[in-house]
Amino acid sequence: MTATVKDELSRLRVAKPCCRRAEMAAMLRFAGGLHIVGGRIVVEAELDTGATARRLRREIAEVFGFPSSVAVLAAGGLRRSVRYIVRVERDGEQLARSTGLLDQRGRPVRGLPPQVVTGSACDAAAAWRGAFLAHGSLTEPGRSCSMEVTSPGPEAALALVGAARRMGVQAKSRDVRGVDRVVVRDGDAIGALLTKIGAHDSLMAWEERRMRREVRATANRLANFDDANLRRSARAAVAAGARVQAAMRILGDDAPDHLLAAGRLRLEHAQASLEELGALADPPLTKDAVAGRIRRLLALADKRANALGIPNTEASVSPELFENA
């Protein structure tokens, strides 16, 4: 869903100047860098969508009045997709100072500028919006759902973690194979963060997919539960049938007719429930009455088996019976 979120954020209009500055500062910090070209400082930002590049150029022009250029790098080699390079050359140093990429002494700022780090909650949201547009990703809802931003260094990552904390969202900074990442994994936290940065339509789509997945997961759990119950019922029916068959072999005709009739019903309708067996009886019986008669039949047979010194009905229930149950 990364492209969906970035497309929506690229079209979002922000009115407050402090928020526009914070967003640009984060976007340039997470997507760009400072270069010395011909003795002058040049600001560059490498972005993955044309809409994001257009947004950055528009903001630089409207907020600071600086012109910029854009170069398109086609996919190929190590580049898996088209990249857009936004470059400010003539006014690069002024832009770097204005956005906090350089401090008052002209030294590069490794994290986010102080005015963003100590700013209000709206500045924190703007910084996250800029960082996500620059180098963010959002995975589909699921067990491993995450909202991530790849950071240029640990200082910028920690600054972004702090910005999330000011919005009441828990984010973590992690070093993954030498690359600093800021990660939000909790589904509710991701939803809150999408709301804060202004991705409301994307949030609705993400929550809908999340809900669909939860419904499917619940349905699967219930299906598995039903399957387990069916397997248990099948195994119980197989065991009951085997014991009844053994009981009738042990007793022969030396058992009350009503008990033998219940046993025959069990053997003739092996998969039927006790309630169904009761309905098949003549006259009809309750399921408790059927269960009681079968129980007495088995007890009578076990008593006879013990007296004769032969295996009782439980001995007829072997593991082989359950191979297909």
Curated annotation (Swiss-Prot):
Pfam families: HTH_WhiA, LAGLIDADG_WhiA, WhiA_N. The keyword Cell cycle applies. Keywords: Cell cycle, Cell division, DNA-binding. GO terms for biological process: cell division; regulation of sporulation. Residues 273-306 bind DNA. Transmembrane segments: none annotated. The keyword Cell division applies. GO terms for molecular function: DNA binding. NCBIfam families: DNA_bind_WhiA. Belongs to the WhiA family. Involved in cell division and chromosome segregation. This is Probable cell division protein WhiA. It comes from Parafrankia sp. (strain EAN1pec). The gene is whiA.
